[in-house]
Regions:
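Catalytic centers of hydrolytic enzymes
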Residues: 32-41, 52-55, 68-72, 76, ...
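Acidic, metal/ion-coordinating pockets
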Residues: 27-309, 315, 357-369, 380, ...
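Bacterial N-terminal signal peptides that target proteins for export
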Residues: 6-15
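C-terminal motif of bacterial Sec signal peptides marking the signal peptidase cleavage site
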Residues: 23-25
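Leucine-biased recognition of intrinsically disordered, low-complexity hydrophobic segments
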Residues: 1-3
């Protein structure tokens, strides 16, 4: 019995020892599994040039609620996932001409959608400065995302200062550079530096720019020694992004905007990405950082945003609220926003880069619609700045697409004017090439051999002859560039015909004229 007891004690000691060994081994394995391996991945969801919060093309493409879903799904796999807006989101938008709670909406719907969708970082685009100073400051204060502004500043009566977000009475100036610290599950940490660069295109009086490339170099020099990677978020032409990559080859990545069609480029080791406008796609970019080897690898994937992606419920609820607000406004003006007006055909080109220098199929359609609305006119004119969509309209085209293309609307006026005034107007149009004051006009009016000598129906414009002209009411205010002379009291205007306000008359709103014209086209 004593011998049996002794053997049992030995077995117990052996089992206890074995248990301790196993426990230590498991603990050590667990520690090894969670030890810092020096590697960390960071995801960016890039969108840019987004003017529409809801899906387009009959609900097939785009939609901020779908972008929100893309980010949330990536977050489930990697908590180091961030959404970036590379400029142009407050304007142009049809909402900017509408009122809610007594004030013009002016991008309020977009900031709310961006907040709900989970945008983390944003920079200015040139169109942010289309709205006035107080409106922009209000949108900034409503935003819950971080702004980075390296070369764009607030011109005030007291001098040039950073733009700032004011919360609870405290102003938080926008940073010229920003360092994001990220950490993964095994404890690897990394620092990513950012700069935000905007092309100096919009010269609003409350904006001041510094030289983009010089500023970028200064920002990079400030960031490079304290960060594992430096990223430039930009809003400029692809050619300028390529030049930036050439000038600063140490950049890890350029997240860009401004062009409305997707762009991808590589200059040296610098990857450049831009998504399609209006969230028809999002670029998914992964920075793979190896801190041990001091290496940065970039992988990219273009994610089309379409009806195969479910809408995030929170974001979608906000979008539907604003859609309802918009539709009530449109209905009061005689529009059925969701009605399809053109089911098929070639996409309509309303890009500013095209319509402010030449005619497109969209501008031709608008001119034909104006002529149909004013059949007795000798000539029709519209300033290209009236067309604000800055995009290509894909089929099907709805009434809403027409509304958002010409958000300011306005009536078609008819006036009799002397040929001398018409010649002066057309000379100003040539001077305005590249800006909104460049005119679109009837094809019967020809600039003979590009000389500035104009003919109508093959006959030279007679300075003393009176011509009946149909034109947008804005042109008659003298507010267009180099056309301050074009006002109702100009002595060379012989007659102004009564303005038509009845919505049954296509001349009451140029958008109604376009919709009516399209409805009469043969399929």
């Amino acid at each position: 019995l004593l011998l049996q007891f002794t053997n049992m004690r030995k077995q117990f000691r052996y089992l206890s020892f074995l248990f301790v060994i196993i426990l230590y081994s498991c603990s050590n394995t667990r520690k090894l599994a969670h030890s810092d391996n020096g590697k960390i991945d960071v995801n960016f969801v890039l969108i840019n040039d987004v003017y529409e919060i809801a899906p387009l093309e009959g609900g097939k493409t785009g939609g901020m609620a779908r972008v929100a879903t893309v980010k949330k799904e990536l977050l489930q796999k990697n908590p180091n996932t961030y959404m970036v807006m590379a400029g142009d989101f407050l304007s142009p938008s049809v909402y900017n001409s509408l009122k809610f709670e007594g004030s013009r909406i002016r991008g309020r719907q977009m900031v709310e959608a961006m907040n709900d969708a989970g945008v983390d970082l944003a920079i200015f685009g040139n169109h942010e400065f289309d709205i006035n100073e107080n409106e922009l400051l209000s949108r900034i204060n409503e935003s819950r995302f971080k702004w980075i502004s390296s070369n764009t500043f607030h011109q005030t009566a007291n001098g040039v200062v950073p733009f700032a977000k004011t919360l609870a009475g405290t102003a938080e100036p926008f940073a010229k550079t920003y360092i994001m610290t990220v950490q993964d599950a095994d404890g690897t940490t990394a620092r990513i530096g950012f700069m935000g660069l905007t092309l100096p295109f919009n010269n609003a009086g409350y904006v001041n720019y510094t030289d983009l490339f010089a500023t970028a170099q200064t920002c990079y020099n400030q960031l490079k020694d304290s960060c594992d990677a430096v990223v430039a978020i930009t809003h400029q032409l692809m050619e300028d992004d390529s030049l930036l990559a050439l000038k600063i080859p140490g950049l890890a990545l350029i997240l860009g905007g401004h062009e409305h069609d997707m762009r991808y480029g590589k200059v040296g080791n610098v990857i450049i990405t831009k998504a399609h406008a209006n969230a028809r796609s999002a670029y998914i970019i992964t920075l793979e950082l190896n801190k041990i080897k001091h290496q940065v690898k970039v992988s990219t994937r273009l994610q089309m945003i379409n009806d195969q992606i479910a809408a995030d419920s929170l974001t979608d609820a906000g979008v539907k609220k604003w859609m309802s607000i918009g539709e009530k406004n449109y209905a009061a003006l005689g529009f059925d926003a969701r009605k399809v007006v053109m089911a098929n055909g070639d996409p309509l080109d309303g890009r500013e880069s095209m319509i402010r220098t030449q005619t497109t199929n969209f501008t031709k359609l608008i001119i034909q619609a104006m002529k149909q609305a004013s059949p007795e006119s000798d000539l029709v004119l519209i300033n290209s700045g009236s067309i604000r969509v800055d995009d290509i309209l894909q089929m099907p085209v709805t009434q809403y697409d027409i509304i958002r293309s010409l958000p300011f609307g306005g009536s078609i006026m008819e006036v009799d004017m002397k040929g001398s005034l018409l010649l002066r107007i057309m000379a100003a149009s040539l001077k305005n090439m590249g800006i909104g004051g460049f005119l679109q006009y009837s094809p019967e009016l020809v600039n003979v051999n590009g000389t500035g000598n104009w003919s109508l129906h093959g006959n030279p414009i007679d300075p003393d002859k009176v011509y009946k002209i149909a034109l947008t009411d804005f042109l008659m205010t003298g507010g267009e560039a180099n056309m301050d002379f074009l006002k109702k009291d100009n002595p060379e205007i012989i007659k102004i015909y009564p303005t038509h306000t009845d919505v049954t008359d296509a001349r009451s709103d140029i958008r109604l004229a376009i919709i009516k014209y399209i409805a009469g086209l043969k399929p």
